[in-house]
From Swiss-Prot:
Belongs to the MDM31/MDM32 family. Residues 205-655 are mitochondrial intermembrane. It holds the Pfam family MDM31_MDM32. Residues 18-183 are mitochondrial matrix. This is Mitochondrial distribution and morphology protein 32. One of its GO terms (cellular component) is mitochondrial inner membrane. Involved in the organization of the mitochondrial membranes and the global structure of the mitochondria. Also required for mitochondrial distribution and mobility as well as for the maintenance of mitochondrial DNA nucleoids structures. The gene is MDM32.
Amino acid sequence: MAGLLPRAYGGVLRRSYIYLGSQCSNSVSRLTVGSTFRLVRMKSWGTSKFHTNGSPVLNEIKKISKSNGITIINPLVNKVTTNNVSTSSNGKAAVAAATAATAVSLGSTGQDDALSRNTDFLHIQNILLQKNQDRMNKQKLLSEATNFYERFKINTKWLLIRGNRPFSADEIGTLFSWIILSQILWIILGTTTFVSILLIIFNTVFAKEMVGNVVGKLLNIFLDGIDVKFQDALVPEWRKGCIRFNNVQLRTHPLQASEPENINDYNELVNNMIEFDLKLHQIELSLSLKKWLLGNGLIQDLTIMGMRGNITVTPVSLENKIDDNQRVNLIDWFSNPYYHLGNVKVTDSSIILHDNQLSKDFKVSIYNLDMPQLRFQWIINDFLSSNVVDGSINHSLFNIHKRQHKLAYIKDLENDLSDWKRITRIRLDSIDVKKLGLNNSNAFNWMDDGQLDIIADVMLPNEQENEPDFDFTRNKKEHMSKSNNKYVVLDLKFRFKDLKAIFPDRAPRLSNGEEILSLDELKQIILFINRKYDLYHSYANSSYKNTLWDAPNIAINKAKSFPVTTVFQSKKDFSNEDSDEEDRKLKKQIIRFHDDISTPNNELVLSCKVVKNINELKNMVLFWETGIYDSLSMELYIDLMKMVEEWEYKKKTNWMTDWGSSVASQLIIVGFGAMV
């Protein structure tokens, strides 16, 4: 039984739902709330409006109801009483009309709300009954199934289409598209997991060594000039969420020697900048398809353990640049300079770094390195921002870490450091000058021997979250309102121990070939350093090797143009404990007319500060490319010249003071003699 009538409220035609009773007898048709209902969708009968009086549809309903003996008591309680009539076509139509009349609004707002509440309740009851019927049908089908395949088929179809009928063409297309989309989403969100499952499948089906060789050959296709070999299986590490490679070998292709006329070729210079032959005990990495789609590389996080091998670096100096507008940097060697890595860790590694520019070999050992990120365009900045770096250069320890404050860390201190992202402390302990290659450098070619300690505090500016590449030209007003700081400040202290100098063949020069100072000016520096060196060693030898040192009140006369009498007080043994204070006063010391020893260990301390724009570090891999070495050299020479001038002034002042006092004393004596 179905009744299709529109409902009008406020003169606007709308769709609605009515519920028709299905409980009819041969003699009586009665609609009650407790009857079984089913949902019938009402459709519009055109654009005619319903009114309480005068509507042709309402008049027709009344006429049919009256002819069949149906009396509408109250349309709001869904209760209709009928007279005893036989079920005929007119009776069915009358029941439909009477039931539809209960859904027609009579112009009262309260009556419409009550009817709406009743229909919602009946709608919910109908849904629950339908679900119960579907559940009974599913249980019946499962009980009739004879094996697992049939039960799986029934459950799958019931989950997808709520039935056991065959799939239609539209449903098959929908399922296929959803499978494809889910796989694409899985690859994007879980690239490492996807590749790990592929490796497990390949390792199961094929030999593990063959899988490693195939993967290595595929990588060689995409990596120009680099050979990759996997000597062991590729094992996914599920607990760490990464892929592990054991016994990996990386090697650059041997390049053929270029012809003499092609030495200045740009591509040839770039290809010969880096050569390496490395063996890695273990590599763990995770992948990210999102980074690869953005052009930042496929590898997300990287962990290297047990790296051994040789690396040869041939920097192209400014003197050998191709032209004035083209500069060759080490970043040009990388095929993708926009490569970004996430967390990078290197442990238990040792390599031999050969610098062709200095013709020196450096043995670099890395005990522990932890970098939160590594961007090829900002290698220097990211390296200085490392969480920790511990290692050694030619068996001299170095470390990079966040500087520890001597005072307690309070909120005021945090506000003072708000302009800086962090302050990094770099320390290099007791490295030999020759092993460091300073004697072969252009700027300090006069250094012959000695030890060097370096302490540097590097202050890095804050990095904007929306500007990871330090592009200060974009959103300039917004950036300048937050922070005006875009400079890197390096505060360095060089402590030379037992430094010895020789006269070089050519004057010190910067990386671009410009002279720092002339050879005549360099003579004063060499004289000052060697005088300190000779004085310290003569003092040490006389203290520990001279047998006359034990004799009291020894006077040493030296033939110089000015008095150089030096008095040493001998060390005496006192048995009386009360004389300890007097013993402390009787120290070996140099009295006047002699060059003072500034430090007991013959140390030469030079301090300097270098300020660099952060944008000048972009696309720079080596420090000498940034020009920091040239700035450091100039600052060190300025500080060294100040020390030499102070030493000469002090020596001259002491001589003039002594000469004046001696002449005055002689004049006084002569005067007294004349008076007598």
